[in-house]
Amino acid sequence: FQAEDGIRDRSPSRGLGDVYKRQSMPAKFAETGKAEGFHALCDDMLYQMKRYFDTSITQPIIGMIRHPLEKFMDSNASLFSKRIRKGRVVQGHGALDPEHIHVQGETVLLSSPQEVYKKYSVLDAANDVATLMLQLMVNGREELSEHFHMKYLEVSRDRELDAILPAYLTYSALMHGVRTCEEKVASSNESLGTVALEFFNLAARYSRELH
């Protein structure tokens, strides 16, 4: 994604499906799409989470997240590899929050995220889908989140998306929790600590959906 990438369609789900077809990554550049690459990203988020809260708070949450994630990745390594072969690991957006989506007439514009988040952009397409779904849900737009999910499935014809989506919802919730902690420190806004914990608890909830 480049700054102000335009999608000539009022539906982000349809536009994303088209963009991802053009931006799938060759296997040699798709290491982060492998189970072990994704595992490392999740471990990094869990480690960063421990930096911001007392162990008595984080340890139970980390346990609820880490064990289901590890079991899922051990059992589904072939699913991650299959998605690389099928071109589902893409040069995505990396931070597909509603604030980066702008509708102008018949065009949906996706503005690029901050440079720091671009290192998270080469991932399974499920990452961007999960990010937008999560943000819509936490902002009270559950129906719109599910509508986007169903439309993306229809357009992308991604039969394995729902098998891997809970893992990326877990990861997205972790990342948003860490980002909120960073904002809390930068702004000295203690109330953001509560918001961050809500994201971490969401990550624990999504991890229970892993099979």
What does each model-found stretch correspond to?
Residues 21-64, 84, 88-89, 163-170:
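A cross-family kinase active-site recognition segment
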Residues 51-91, 198-210:
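An alpha-helical support segment within catalytic cores of ATP-dependent transferases
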